[in-house]
Regions:
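Short intrinsically disordered, low-complexity segments
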Residues: 15-16, 55, 88
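N-terminal helix-turn-helix DNA-binding core of bacterial DNA-binding proteins
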Residues: 4-45, 70-80
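Alpha-helical residues within the helix-turn-helix
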Residues: 40, 57-58
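Residues within the DNA-recognition helix of helix-turn-helix
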Residues: 52
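Beta-hairpin "wing" of winged helix-turn-helix
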Residues: 58-67, 74
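Amphipathic alpha-helical dimerization/coiled-coil segments
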Residues: 1-5, 26-27, 77-120
Length: 120
């Protein structure tokens, strides 16, 4: 991942509503959430949320797809994974004794029966 893309993604998440929106979308994977439902869940006006989702979309952290009369947003876990790996690529000078606990703590906590979908 290039520095510029990582900076764009991290900057997009460096705002409370956008961070909360992204985390909510992660919780609703793999199905995503309709924009109106997400606005109600976050208790923000739809037009305000739309602006925030645009920022997250530009950073490629969320994707959107029209479903009938709704737009469904999903967290782009593939890009998020690239950002996390970018931040950790030189972790602890490569010392496995130091890195292992950190990497282990980053393992997904999803229920085992839930299908994981990684979309880019």
């Amino acid at each position: 991942m290039e520095d510029e893309k990582a900076i764009l993604a991290l900057a997009a998440l460096a705002q409370p509503t956008r961070l909360q929106a992204f985390r909510t979308l992660v919780k609703h994977e793999p199905g995503g959430m309709a924009a109106g439902d997400l606005a109600r869940a976050l208790e923000v006006p739809q037009n305000t949320l739309s602006a925030h989702l645009t920022v997250l979309s530009r950073a490629e952290l969320v994707t959107s797809e029209r479903h009938s009369r709704s737009i469904v947003y999903r967290a782009n876990l593939g890009v998020f994974q690239k950002v996390a790996l970018f931040l950790l690529q030189d972790c602890c000078g490569g010392d496995p004794e130091i890195c292992a606990p950190l990497i282990e703590s980053l393992q997904p906590r999803c229920p085992p029966n839930r299908k994981e979908r990684n979309h880019v």
